[in-house]
Each structure stands twice: as structure tokens, then as C-alpha cells.
Amino acid sequence: MSIQLLDKTRKINRLLNDKHSSKVAFADICFVLGQMLLANAYIISSKGKLLGTYVNDDGMIPSFQSKQGSYIETMLNERFLNVLSTKENVNLETLGFSKEERQGVEALITPISIGGERLGTLFLCRCQKAFSIEDIILSEYSTTVVGLEIMRSIQEESDIEQHKKSNFSSALTTLTPLEQKAVSYVFHAMGGEDGTLVTSKLAGKIG
């Protein structure tokens, strides 16, 4: 491993060791990667959502949606997901981009997977410079970091949802049978087509 590559991986490591945050921002990873490789960097979820972006050259691929939080086209995301191992210096026409857009643009696609589960894609592109072996190593190292962060986020959301359900169940146990029945009617009414609650009707139904 060259000294330059070692320095670059250490910059990624610093994001993991940031004491000011308990989580790694995908945008920060894109920023660091993009600046080191002089490339546009995009982290895309398996559903096609742009979790993080860094644009080094906003005129490189005009038709590509690059706003963080937005979704890329379904067909494009499917093409990304069909890439099962790192592909360097990809012809953009194979992804559905026009011949004009691919002129002089080199792309690097690295799957984001943990434990055999596909979580997303890292997409890097830049003008007039092919991606090297060291660039590939750095991208694959970065996708490991991103994959672990995605898994952590999924687990965190699951824990929050489970906590909400637990609190709701605990709250129900403090109610009388009649109150529990009333709550049941309320939630049933909230799921109605008009989305409104009529308390007099509820009172009549509950008795």
C-alpha cells in the first residue's frame, strides 16, 4: 500500500472517529472521497435514494439527478444494482446516458453490501482521468464504512419503532377495559376514508 493511499484511508477513518457525532454523515464521506479523487461522488440506497452527494463538476452529467434526498430514475438504479462487483472506467452509455454525456467521462461503480445483503451503490465519475487500482481500493474500503453506517441506521430506526410500540403497549395496560375499547374505536375511525373523527358517533357506538 502506498503512502498516498494510506493517507486517504486515514481520512475516511477520521470520519468514524469523530467525537462530535455518533453517526457518519453520508454527505461527509462523499465530500472526502470527491475531494481526494477529484470526482463527483454519490451514495445511492438500494431503493434509488441519494443518501449523500458531492459534485466536483456540475456540468459533467447534466441529466443525472444529483440533489441529496431525491431519487434517481428506476431503470438507472436497476442498472446500478445489476453491478455485482466493482466496475472501473465504465462506459456511461451502458447505464443509459447519451453518447454526448459519456464523452471524456470515466465512472467507477462499487456495490455497497454487508453480509450478502445489497444496501446500495457508490457511484464516482470524473473527466479525462481513468480510475486506478488505488482508487478502486479506496472506493471498496469506503463502501464498507458506508455499509456499516447504513446497517447502523436501519437498526436505530428499528429500535425507535420498537420503543414506540413498547410505550404504546405499556400505556394501554393502564387503561380500563372501556377506555381500551374507546381507543380501539378511535384508531379504527382514523383509518376511515374521510380521515375525520366524530366524537358523538364514537360515543354512541361505544355506549
Say what each PLM segment does.
Residues 2-11, 19-103:
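Structured interaction and signal-relay segments at domain junctions
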Residues 2-17, 22-23, 29, 68-69, ...:
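Juxtadomain coupling helices with adjacent low-complexity linkers
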Residues 86-96, 139, 195-207:
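Short secondary-structure transition/capping segments
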Residues 101-112:
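A short beta-strand signature within small-molecule sensing/ligand-binding domains used
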Residues 112-122:
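Short hydrophobic/glycine-rich mini-motifs in sensory/regulatory modules
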Residues 152-207:
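Signal-transducing coiled-coil/dimerization helices and immediately adjacent hinge/linker segments
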